[in-house]
Design a protein with these regions (language model features):
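Alpha/beta-hydrolase fold active-site loops
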Residues: 43-44, 124
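Structural recognition of the beta-strand scaffold that forms the well-ordered cores
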Residues: 44-47, 75-78, 100-103
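Structural microenvironment flanking redox-active thiols in thiol-disulfide oxidoreductases
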Residues: 58-96, 107-116
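N-proximal helix/coil linker or "cap" segments that precede and/or mark the start of modular domains
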Residues: 1-27, 32, 37, 42, ...
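Conserved redox-active cysteine motifs that mediate thiol-disulfide chemistry
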Residues: 40-41, 47-65
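Thiol/disulfide oxidoreductase modules built on the thioredoxin-like
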Residues: 97, 106-154
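Active-site acidic short loop of glycosyltransferases
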Residues: 40-42, 72, 97, 120
Length: 155
């Protein structure tokens, strides 16, 4: 655990506005490989969440509203963390998540953990990425600052 948190602290310096978003490949709910760079040309929100996270679940209706409003220019990628595959898939189905959903396995080494690479230290964490693949902003928690920034960015 200590090594994981040290890596998160090191990653924080790289996950800032204007920096390239680290590329990754993870499995989708239908067991296909998804690579972040495949969405170049669109705005992207990485939503780091888990089925166990109350605030993550409470934020789903608002995320759906923004997704419906901006889906012609925006893709959301739900990155499930610290879950079992079964709980993740059940949550995707139960909450009818309409966007891309990928699973970040909890048993991978910290150096291969996407949540570590994106310096996620709490949930939910949302990262807005521009069509050029550069990070626009990172937002921890479920609050209006993320939605205001997203609206201002995409409008």
């Amino acid at each position: 655990k200590a090594g994981k948190y040290r890596l998160i602290r090191l990653a924080e310096a790289k996950i800032v506005a204007g920096s390239p978003a680290p590329d990754f490949t993870l499995k989708t709910a239908d067991d296909k490989n998804f690579t972040l760079s495949s969405l170049r040309g669109k705005y992207v929100v990485l939503d780091f969440w888990g089925s166990w996270c109350g605030w993550c679940i409470k934020g789903i209706p608002e995320m759906k509203r923004y997704y419906d409003r901006y889906k012609s220019k925006l893709e959301i990628v739900g990155v499930d963390c610290n879950d079992t595959p079964e709980r993740w898939l059940a949550a995707v189905e139960e909450h009818r998540l309409p966007w891309i959903n990928v699973y970040n396995p909890k048993d991978v080494p910290a150096a291969e953990d996407i949540s570590v690479e994106y310096a996620v230290s709490g949930y939910p964490t949302k990262v807005i990425i521009g069509p050029d693949g550069l990070i626009i902003g990172k937002y921890a928690g479920e609050g209006p600052d993320f939605y205001e920034a997203l609206h201002k960015t995409i409008q």
